[in-house]
């Protein structure tokens, strides 16, 4: 199983609440999730959040959301927490929450390369 995990911290230092900033009429992170879900080689996309405020803001969207600790120092730490909670995965892709225009073909290409026997 190939899983994309999107770490989404609400209170980033440089731009607090960036993930909830409206873009195309919805929170930025929603655009990121929707684009990630278009990747054909991902079996699952998980949004890893750290606050009830984010959870409430996204309640109308049908996404796979996992609440994580607020005490992580990095998105990688947040992803590691999620990985411990989920089923086994062949490939984990770290997709940044502030990449609302990510091209799903890039995700697919990365997975193809990682699945290649020559890797």
Protein language model regions, located:
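Conserved donor-nucleotide/metal-binding helix-loop-beta segment in metal-dependent transferases, i.e.
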Residues: 103-119
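N-terminal glycine-rich phosphate-binding loop and ensuing alpha1 helix
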Residues: 1-49
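Short aromatic/hydrophobic "clamp" motif used to bind/position activated sugar donors
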Residues: 92-94
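Conserved acidic residues
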Residues: 2, 43, 90, 118-119
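Conserved N-terminal catalytic core of the sugar/cofactor nucleotidyltransferase
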Residues: 30-90
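Acidic metal-phosphate-binding loop of nucleotide-sugar-dependent transferases
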Residues: 72, 99-101
């Amino acid at each position: 199983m190939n899983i994309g995990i999107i770490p989404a911290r609400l209170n980033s230092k440089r731009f607090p609440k960036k993930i909830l900033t409206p873009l195309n009429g919805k929170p930025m992170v929603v655009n990121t999730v929707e684009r990630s879900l278009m990747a054909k080689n991902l079996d699952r996309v998980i949004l890893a959040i750290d606050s009830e405020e984010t959870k409430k803001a996204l309640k109308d969207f049908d996404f796979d959301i996992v609440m994580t600790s607020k005490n992580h120092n990095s998105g990688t730490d947040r992803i590691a927490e999620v990985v411990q909670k989920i089923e086994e995965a062949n490939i984990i892709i770290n997709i940044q929450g502030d990449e609302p225009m990510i091209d799903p073909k890039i995700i697919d290409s990365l997975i193809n390369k990682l699945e290649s026997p020559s890797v």
